[in-house]
Amino acid sequence: MTRAFDGDTLLIATHNKGKLEEMAHLLQPFGVKVVGAAEMNLPEPEETEDTFVGNARIKAHAAARATGLPALSDDSGITIDALDGAPGVYTADWAETGNGRDFLMAMTRAHDALEAKSAPHPRLAQFRCTLVLAWPDGHDEVFEGVAPGHLVWPIRGAAGFGYDPMFVPEGYDVTFAEMDRWEKNKISHRARAVEKFVKGCFGG
């Protein structure tokens, strides 16, 4: 059975302000105070695992140990069937330029790799999000969300971020980047993982 969250403060093990604000909004009905890693002056631990859950566990447990607070972290990315699950945990790395991240470059890399393999259409892919809630005593709970879909080229849409302009979610004919934010947030991998987290740990 999932361990319930019964504290009054939850540390979000991220330096991403957007993720912090999103979680604060989602947990507002439960009266939980949310603090971020930057607020607690926590360094970003090195992500050395080759799975989403492994990297999420590293971040959550490091934050819980350092602060004595329950800590929630996430690791997410896109897996492409014809590329044997790549880029996977290296989703963001594919965009690294040494001068910031360039996701147009990353999407082009994915498309070129598919073309090189003459991958058939539809080119199936999944966005994946793994949330880990860790307690200072070493216990953790894992929640995973998946958004299945396929990739298109050329890219479409100006909203969203990352690989959104090339990803069409299952059951739709528009990319994540062509959707309203509220519409994407209802069906995204992150939304599905958060829904499981809230239901499991808050009974919401």
UniProtKB/Swiss-Prot annotation:
Details of cofactor binding: Binds 1 Mg(2+) ion per subunit.
EC number: 3.6.1.66
One Gene Ontology term, aspect cellular component: cytosol
GO terms of molecular function: dITP diphosphatase activity; ITP diphosphatase activity; metal ion binding; nucleotide binding; ribonucleoside triphosphate phosphatase activity; XTP diphosphatase activity
Origin species: Ruegeria pomeroyi (strain ATCC 700808 / DSM 15171 / DSS-3)
Keyword Metal-binding (UniProt): yes
Residue positions binding Mg(2+): E46, D75
Family annotation (InterPro entries): dITP/XTP_pyrophosphatase (IPR020922), ITPase-like_fam (IPR029001), RdgB/HAM1 (IPR002637)
Active site (record annotation): D75
Role: Pyrophosphatase that catalyzes the hydrolysis of nucleoside triphosphates to their monophosphate derivatives, with a high preference for the non-canonical purine nucleotides XTP (xanthosine triphosphate), dITP (deoxyinosine triphosphate) and ITP. Seems to function as a house-cleaning enzyme that removes non-canonical purine nucleotides from the nucleotide pool, thus preventing their incorporation into DNA/RNA and avoiding chromosomal lesions.
Cofactors, names only: Mg(2+)
Annotated Pfam families: Ham1p_like
GO biological process, any: nucleotide metabolic process
Binding site for substrate: T14, H15, N16, K17, G18, K19, S76, F161, G162, Y163, D164, K184, H189, R190
Catalytic activity: XTP + H2O = XMP + diphosphate + H(+); dITP + H2O = dIMP + diphosphate + H(+); ITP + H2O = IMP + diphosphate + H(+)
Family stated for the protein in its record: Belongs to the HAM1 NTPase family.
Binding partners and assembly: Homodimer.
Protein name (record): dITP/XTP pyrophosphatase
Keywords, in A-Z order: Hydrolase, Magnesium, Metal-binding, Nucleotide metabolism, Nucleotide-binding
Source superkingdom: Bacteria
